[in-house]
Structures are given as C-alpha cells and as structure tokens.
Amino acid sequence: KSVRAGKFTVEFIHVNHSIADSVAFAIHTKMGTIVHTGDFKIDSTPIDGEVIDLARLGELGKEGVLCLCADSTNVERPGFTPSEKVVGATFMRQFQNCDERIIVTTFASNVHRVQQVLDAAAQCGRKVAVTGRSMENMMKVSTELGYMKVPKNTLVDINKLKGLPKNKQVIVTTGSQGEEMSALYRMAFSTHKQVE
C-alpha cells in the first residue's frame, strides 16, 4: 500500500517487530527512493503469521535505493535472533514447572509477547491479572482491535488474585527497564497497593 504526500509517494512494507503491524517506508522521490526501516527483526515464524516482506525490500534494492536508513537491535552481533515463538515455548515450560506466583514484565507495546503469556497461563490453568496503566490500556485497545485474543476465563482483576492459590497466579506488568514508578518497581519495594 502507498499514499501520496505532496511530491512524494510513500510505500508501506511489512516488517516484524515487537509492535504489531510495523512497517518500513519506501519514500519515492524524483531524486530516488529512500528506505526507512524503523526497528525491525527478521522472524520467519512470527506470532501473527505475517513475515517481513523481504521480497519487496529485495526488489527495491535491485531498482536502486538512494538512501537506506535501517535500524535493528543487536545488528552488530553475528547470527540470528530467535523467533518470538521461542519465548512462548519458554513460558510454557516455566508455567508448567513453577509452583508459585509468576510475574512477567515486558514492554506494554509487545502485544504478541503478552498474548503468549495469556495462552501459556490458560493452558496451565492459571489466571492472569494485569497491572500498570500502560499495560492495562494496551490490553484494552489491542483486544478491541483484534490484535489480542484473551482465552475465556483467564483474565481476572488484580484484586481477585488474593483469593487464588499462588500456583494459579500470573501477573503481567510494566517495568521491564526498572522504571522507578512502574508497577514492577513498586512490587519489588512493597509499595504496590494490590500485590504483596
């Protein structure tokens, strides 16, 4: 898909990233094409089934690119980054083998990772509570837009966790980078109002 923006035509090219529906831009100008990838990852088995459009990126390369602005975390490391599905398999192993409460922290924007937490919890008979404003907002919006499918009877209010055995609890929260006001930080310092 592409749109006109003044004298430019901007083409959207699907890429994989922790944020659903990420795209690279091919900006077609009279001087040549500028490709801006944004942060991306090559994942041949992404959670949503939508693989990066390497074919289109290759076509653009053959046509000639005036400027490439590319960003990919850990690009300087040799080898490949594992698929996000590897994380889901790890969740399953941990959820099956843990006899206590599980707390998972991730970026609120990582919808696919949260989906894998929900799926693993449901398969292991655990209930999931969400805490952290950005995580709560992401869950609401991504569910409404169809990016996330919450397994039936899996999600519970954070205040209802106290009535469940700890081996049936999963908390998904913000704070994966140690932010001082995040829910995880407050849990770690026993200042979270709903989690002991």
Positions of PLM-derived features:
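His/Asp/Glu-rich metal-coordinating catalytic cores
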Residues: 1-164, 176-194
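Short, surface-exposed beta-edge/turn micro-motifs
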Residues: 167-169
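Short beta-strand segments
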Residues: 172-174
